[in-house]
Amino acid sequence: MLKEEDKIFTNLHGQQSHDLKSSKKRGDWENTKALLDKGRDFIVEEVKKSGLRGRGGAGFSTGMKWSFMPKNSEKPCYLVVNADESEPGTCKDRDILRFEPHKLIEGCLLASFAIGANNCYIYIRGEFYNEASNIQRALDEAYKEGLIGKNACDSGFDCNIYLHRGAGAYICGEETALLESLEGKKGMPRLKPPFPAGFGLYGCPTTINNVESIAVVPTILRRGASWFAGIGKPNNTGTKIFCISGHVNKPCNVEEAMGISLKELIEKYAGGVRGGWDNLKAIIPGGSSVPLLPKLLCEVEMDFDSLRTAGSGLGTGGIIVMDKSTDIIYAIARLSKFYMHESCGQCTPCREGTGWMWRVMMRLVKGNAKKSEIDELLNVTKEIEGHTICALGDAAAWPIQGLIRHFRSEIEARIKSYSVV
């Protein structure tokens, strides 16, 4: 369990103002110049030592990603913050943008300095109008105080931060599709290699990080890498914001230590499952893209490695709780429709496969199918998985795989009852 003094996001629920004056009282922008004076290498190494892994879903080492940037590039370098949070069940970045904007902006300055980028872009989801307004106000305050811009914090380093609003496409949450959109093109993922660190925004070296990944950096540098590494578990260090929704008594966002049990999270912070733990049917533990877990596995620890071992993933930390009243087949079919709608259409397996999977899923919802089609559907998900430019194909396949793995008997019973009728 996370101690109160170890929390990074002390205004996560917006009890206090998010303006500069209030943010400074909570510790933001405290002697930022001293952190910059320690140099680029110090910041990168400290973030590496902390064990911080990307909070957007992939879980790649943040410090390692920064170290891929060229030291003396002839081209300008860029930092891009992915605030295009569109994953169903996920709203952690939204609350950072709403209530902790200065944590993000200070993190942008420190990360930009670490990778040698004089320009940073915050790409925010188009629907986040109020959040974009909050960020812009915070940017205006920071510019006015000399915290960013020319000679940021009197450090001799110039850092301009720009806010760019997207247009509501889920695919633009994929880092290279985001870059395409930022350049004014259609948001479609790029083939990799080349990777963004070598050929990113406008063909220049670029690092793309999630909002939460950047927002925790100032606190890590102030308190030290060993402090952050001491929270959680080895290889799964630090704190994480979890979004708990669905059939719970008190849906909420909460910051907790990595490795906390899923059951403890739900019972301590969300008031427990509606109707009690025995009424639980399944949980999606990391946003809609990861396979669900049946009740039997729902006491798993919430970290990258434990959830992978359990056959799912931490993803974004978006916990969707489903009680026994849930039509589990229809719930996953609804996710299939989402991925069909959000596919950019660039890759044939995803373009054709997502629609095909949704149509089969809707027949399974009614029971109007043959039992052999369950295995046929499973085989198609495996043909899509790993055969697309980006991970949207995987994201569409995994929920169905989880459903068939854990609830095949329920699908078969639905088919049997339909044939009897």
From Swiss-Prot:
**What EC number(s) does its UniProt record assign?**
7.1.1.-
Region named Disordered: 1-25
| GO molecular function terms noted in the UniProt entry | 4 iron, 4 sulfur cluster binding; FMN binding; metal ion binding; NAD binding; NADH dehydrogenase (ubiquinone) activity; quinone binding
Q: How is the cofactor bound?
A: Binds 1 FMN. Binds 1 [4Fe-4S] cluster.
Query: What domain of life is recorded for the organism?
Result: Bacteria
- Where, in this chain's numbering, is NAD(+) bound? G54, R55, G56, G57, A58, G59, F60, S61, T62, G63
Q: What class of enzyme is it?
A: translocase
User: What's the catalysed reaction?
Assistant: a quinone + NADH + 5 H(+)(in) = a quinol + NAD(+) + 4 H(+)(out)
The record's section on SMART domains has: NADH_4Fe-4S
The record lists [4Fe-4S] cluster as bound by C344, C347, C350, C390
Q: Write out the similarity annotation.
A: Belongs to the complex I 51 kDa subunit family.
Its function, per the record, reads: NDH-1 shuttles electrons from NADH, via FMN and iron-sulfur (Fe-S) centers, to quinones in the respiratory chain. Couples the redox reaction to proton translocation (for every two electrons transferred, four hydrogen ions are translocated across the cytoplasmic membrane), and thus conserves the redox energy in a proton gradient.
Q: Supply the name of the protein.
A: NADH-quinone oxidoreductase subunit F
